[in-house]
């Protein structure tokens, strides 16, 4: 928990204080009073009866003593339960394929009033210009959009080609920005553990803020060393005992449930009354189809309550107050005097049925957000421009030669997990000794003209066709999976022609494609339109075989070297346990 930065975020003038105090004392008129409401008590459990009094962007009072207080406007909550606005503790908005403006439109009416965002996806493509755009969006947003300064661009030095650097000097230029809460996930945990000075310099520079971690499966002395360096949290835990050990050693645990990485079922049993202040909820990567059909943080709260029997006040605590405290945002996370009036009114607290949302003391209207979206996006000056510096490819670019009797490494996918297994398969004149092997390739897209890095993929479920994308963490080169070189080339050429995007090919034809004109990562379409296009993509992909629930998000992580066990970058096959490149053919 970091309390040293509270002064940065609780901006209130002396005049505002005097007005707020006057309303609290009952000597002045409130802007809004919410009547006929019960407030969920996140500290003691149970509920508090009585109105919520709002002056400006803050809560001036709570409780029955304000029943007859005067207000410019009264809101009848019709018996609703009031809870603090939801907070996502760690996400990459780019992974939703929505701009920050569109993301706000899609999620704020669902009660997501605050996000802690690491924009390292766009920073990997276009460097500081990408971070600057996110900062502009955050400055104008109604949603509280806070930024962690991206720490590992690229994710692992020397392992991949990305589009830009983000130097310590550039990082420091953003450290004191009012929307910055700390240093984003330190993915090079072997470098931190070994004491690499360049990484320790970054940690030292941001030590007075919050230092995000990233250490899937780490334990023993290595985990102790990583925490000793100052890392405060981790969102990559996927096993119960792993999460328990991190909590025991003083880490805060972010329980992640995204579109590909689904760790809530494994980790939710850890949450209890004692450790809930150290537990938070995050999505990391969640696409607009799931947001539209299932929800965002609201969906995670619902599952904690319905599937894991987490008490109401604890479920809502880990979705708000715990995260606010961890990031030093002490003006958020509680419905109490002096706190920012980020309020979610629920007609059913167990089902997380959102009736109305207020943020910074003002009611949110979904239709108004939608109507203003285009103008607000233009005002943010998005960094348009083609970032795909790659010529069209041919089938011969994906030709691999295999020798009968030889054994070859296979990246084995685990559906709905980011980790993979490293297995092998023997080749014969009839093919491989398992029938689920596809081809995978990663093509550098930043003008270095490297030959495609090629490998083998098992367990993905692709029986025919090809899938290609320019969303491939974290360097966002072109990744393609296919059963034939010809269809792989067709899919790659479509995303090149689109200036970035996603594509499904089957029967020698493009079945569906989605252009992503901002950095090859984001669309400028509305959330509804984007969800419909993703629905069409998923339907086309399902025709290719029994793929993961979110095939494109799962595919995007097959090139991320900082998550074990075997990955493919633009430089070749990478062993994520030894942190070293390896060969396609097994020779030892």
Curated annotation (Swiss-Prot):
pH dependence remark: Optimum pH is 6.5-7.0.
Temperature dependence: Optimum temperature is 60 degrees Celsius.
Comment field (misc): Ade is a cryptic gene in wild-type strains. The physiological conditions that lead to its activation are unknown.
Chemical reaction(s) catalysed: adenine + H2O + H(+) = hypoxanthine + NH4(+)
GO biological-process terms attached to the record: adenine catabolic process
Family: Belongs to the metallo-dependent hydrolases superfamily. Adenine deaminase family.
Molecular function per GO: adenine deaminase activity; catalase activity; ferrous iron binding; manganese ion binding; protein homodimerization activity
Source organism: Escherichia coli (strain K12)
Protein name listed in UniProt: Adenine deaminase
Entry-linked InterPro entries: Adenine_deam, Adenine_deam_C, Amidohydro-rel, Metal-dep_hydrolase_composite, Metal_Hydrolase
This protein's UniProt keywords: Hydrolase, Manganese
A matching Pfam family: Adenine_deam_C
Cofactor dependence: Mn(2+)
């Amino acid at each position: 928990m970091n309390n040293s930065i509270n002064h940065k975020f609780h901006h209130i003038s002396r005049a505002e204080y005097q007005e707020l105090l006057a309303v609290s004392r009952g000597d002045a008129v409130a802007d809004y009073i919410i009547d006929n409401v019960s407030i969920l008590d996140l500290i003691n459990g149970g509920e508090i009866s009585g109105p919520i009094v709002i002056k400006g962007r803050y809560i001036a009072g709570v409780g029955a003593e304000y029943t007859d207080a005067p207000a410019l406007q009264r809101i009848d909550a019709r018996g609703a339960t009031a809870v603090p606005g939801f907070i996502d503790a760690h996400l990459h908005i780019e992974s939703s394929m929505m701009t920050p403006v569109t993301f706000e439109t899609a999620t704020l009416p669902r009660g997501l009033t605050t996000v802690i965002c690491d924009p390292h996806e766009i920073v990997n493509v276009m460097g500081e210009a990408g971070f600057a755009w996110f900062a502009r969006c955050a400055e104008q947003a109604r949603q509280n959009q806070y930024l962690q300064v991206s720490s590992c661009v690229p994710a692992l030095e020397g392992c991949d080609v990305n589009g830009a650097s983000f130097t310590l000097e550039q990082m420091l230029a953003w450290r004191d920005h009012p929307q910055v809460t700390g240093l984003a996930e330190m993915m090079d945990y072997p470098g931190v553990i070994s004491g690499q000075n360049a990484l320790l310099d970054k940690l030292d520079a941001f030590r007075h803020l919050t230092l995000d971690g990233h250490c899937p499966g780490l334990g023993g002395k290595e985990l102790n060393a990583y925490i000793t360096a100052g890392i405060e949290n981790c969102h990559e835990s996927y096993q119960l005992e792993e999460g328990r050990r991190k909590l025991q050693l003083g880490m805060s645990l972010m329980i992640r449930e995204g579109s590909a990485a689904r760790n809530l079922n494994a980790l939710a049993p850890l949450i209890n009354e004692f450790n809930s202040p150290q537990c938070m909820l995050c999505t990391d990567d969640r696409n607009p189809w799931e947001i539209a059909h299932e929800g965002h943080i609201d969906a995670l709260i619902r599952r904690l309550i319905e599937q894991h029997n987490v008490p109401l006040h604890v479920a809502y605590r880990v979705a708000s107050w715990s995260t606010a405290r961890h990031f030093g945002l002490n003006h958020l996370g509680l419905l109490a005097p002096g706190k920012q009036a980020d309020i979610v009114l629920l007609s059913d607290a167990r089902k997380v049925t959102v009736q109305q949302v207020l943020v910074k003391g003002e009611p949110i209207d979904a239709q108004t957000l939608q109507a203003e979206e285009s103008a607000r996006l233009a005002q943010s000056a998005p960094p348009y421009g083609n970032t795909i510096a790659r010529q069209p490819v041919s089938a011969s670019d994906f030709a691999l030669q295999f020798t009968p009797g030889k054994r070859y490494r296979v990246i084995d996918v685990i559906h709905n997990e980011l980790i993979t297994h490293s297995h092998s398969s023997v080749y014969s004149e009839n093919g491989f000794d398992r029938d689920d092997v596809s081809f995978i390739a990663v093509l550098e897209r930043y003008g270095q003209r490297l030959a495609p890095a090629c490998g083998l993929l098992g367990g993905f479920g692709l029986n025919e066709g090809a899938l290609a994308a320019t969303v491939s963490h974290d360097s966002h080169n072109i990744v393609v999976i296919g059963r034939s070189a010809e269809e792989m080339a067709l899919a790659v050429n479509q995303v090149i022609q689109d200036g970035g995007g996603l594509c499904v090919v089957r029967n020698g034809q493009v079945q569906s494609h989605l252009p992503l004109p901002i950095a090859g990562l984001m669309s400028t379409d509305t959330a509804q339109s984007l969800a419909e296009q993703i629905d069409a993509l998923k339907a086309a992909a399902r025709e290719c075989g029994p793929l993961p629930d979110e095939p494109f998000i799962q595919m995007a992580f097959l090139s991320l070297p900082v998550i074990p066990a075997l990955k493919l970058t633009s430089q070749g096959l990478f062993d994520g346990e030894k942190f070293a490149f390896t060969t396609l053919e097994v020779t030892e």
